[in-house]
């Protein structure tokens, strides 16, 4: 059976699966229900499934929620039908899965990476929003699959089922990596450092959506990844009465203001794109109280890892200087980070030659440069560094609103076409 026929046969099941994932979104490191459902499915298909601490370098995890938050998410996942044994194995920030199937005969080790986490977004309730109208809007407060990771999990499991059903036709090994905490670029490093791709010959990452210009297209590479670092900076001062004794205060808010203005003024780099954004600034408790704490949440980006490093060092210098100017102390904590990703152009050209003849996409461009950041770069770079090849593909979709927007939604036909493409690519290299 061709991949196209298989997907058509499983169409209703795959759409229902995507809608189930969509209805139960879980943010970074809290993907207990999602990961348990994924693992249960992979086990039932006959995959050798490793998960939790077995596929994570625990010290390399970034931006973990508190134990209290994680425990509440674990309990909720079990209440919502997750396998309790699997939740326990992946508990407290260990929601990572690697599924492997070895086929008969010698062949390459081919890996696909899938991300699972949701966004901190309140999903729209309007009738023109298909998930709301169709009854599969998020049932979790302040969590939404607003970046297509619900579709990614479905595509990964659709690929897994196709390969398992047709396993006698293949040679080599398939490795399916289901990664937590892509949002905020917090999860891939821990899996890469655990060595999960060290034996991989061909590495594929992918994403659905992006913009209307890419609708019903399949891009075979993405050369636009920016390196990025996510930082929290906290200034500590000393509060005093704003009218009675202002001279005794150490104003943390002023330190924060000084930092924000000068962070945004960092000279941009001549060798490529550089970015700085302070997305959150929190300070103050009352109009007549000098603020003693200020919190900044910021990010840097760079076209190369070196440019991003330049932005980080300038940011740290400015934060330190702002603290000293206002007689405050400070602390900086890293919440997420990824290098710039590398692509094997020859592999991307091969993918183009494999997908184009399918005739299901209006265009199959060689490259799409989105200008965002993706911690799949850890996997891509590690495979290339060890002599393998890697690329990152984009399944274009007629999205209803921008990524991370309350009205975001993908076209499920594009998701199904994406499974056809992934299955065809995998089959090509495993035959």
Regions found by a protein language model. Give the residues of each.
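General structural feature for long, well-ordered alpha-helical segments within catalytic domains
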Residues: 10-13, 17, 30, 34-38, ...
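Histidine/acidic-residue-rich, glycine-tolerant segments that coordinate divalent metal ions
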Residues: 63, 97, 119-121, 127-144, ...
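Metal-dependent amide/peptide-bond hydrolase catalytic core
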Residues: 44, 253-431
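Acidic/His- and Gly-rich active-site-bordering loop/insert found
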Residues: 2-145, 158, 169-170
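Short Gly/Pro-enriched turn/cap motifs at secondary-structure boundaries
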Residues: 86-91, 182, 221-225, 367-370
